[in-house]
Amino acid sequence: MELPTRIRIDTQSVESRTIVEVESEDRLGLLHRISNVLTRHDLNIHVARISTEKGAAIDTFYVRTKSGGKPTDENKLDELKRELETELG
């Protein structure tokens, strides 16, 4: 059974970081692909919670910009979401 990829970006729950949550079918190289997209968007991962169960991956990343700020630009975050969906789709 194929699990659809879902991306959720939350700028409200944590004051100093943006949360990027990825739900997807678990597969070889998934974390590598996600981290490459985050890097291309000049984001640093400060905390990652990685969970897999029965072929599903739920990976949550708390990110900041390379300059240490909280990513909040909606256009850039929409672009990040689209690229993650394309990369993992």
What are the residue ranges of the model-derived segments?
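A conserved regulatory-domain signal marking ACT and ACT-like small-molecule sensing domains
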Residues: 1-89
